[in-house]
Amino acid sequence: MRLTIVGCSGSYPGPDSPASCYLLEADVGDGEDKRVWRILLDLGNGALGQLHRYVDPLSIDAVLISHHHADHCLDMCGYYVMRKYHPTGPQPPIPVWGPAGTAERVARAYELPVDPGMTEEFDFHTYDGPFTIGPFTILPIPVDHPIEAYGMRISAGGSTMGYSGDTAPCEGLDRIAANVRLLLCEASFRDTDENP
């Protein structure tokens, strides 16, 4: 499993980084039978443009949205346009996993009617226990944020990583972090006003 940090700015994109977006890749097979599976953890504002530096955005197999704040999901709007109106024609739908209401949230962000919204470009699923995408096994875990939010444990190729999403310290974060090889963890909302 390989990780590329596409963007990690909090709340809004910065001059050198878009908002949250993490690319995970895992290989299956060898030689001519080799296939690279790719998933995105979040697709925050500014991330779609930066993603081009690493992979063709049309090669993404699934998108996992941790929660509905713009810095974690807003570039789904641009991705919708890319998949719907690409010069090679409309692209087949890919799975998008997220909290309840993800399909409605991204449709509203683009001022689309909720029905059909973006359902012809994306196959929306609500987190409800573990699931697989190619070689990846994903376990979504609720975390502590002002809105419904999830962190997750992602396993592939014998390794497990954790992604906190946005959260305060909580039991869910402890579960995400337990015995992982790598933990991507939010670091904000400090107790003091002094920043390092």
Spans of model-derived segments:
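Binuclear metal-dependent hydrolase catalytic cores
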Residues: 1-164, 168-170
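Cap/insert and terminal regions of metallo-dependent hydrolase folds
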Residues: 168-196
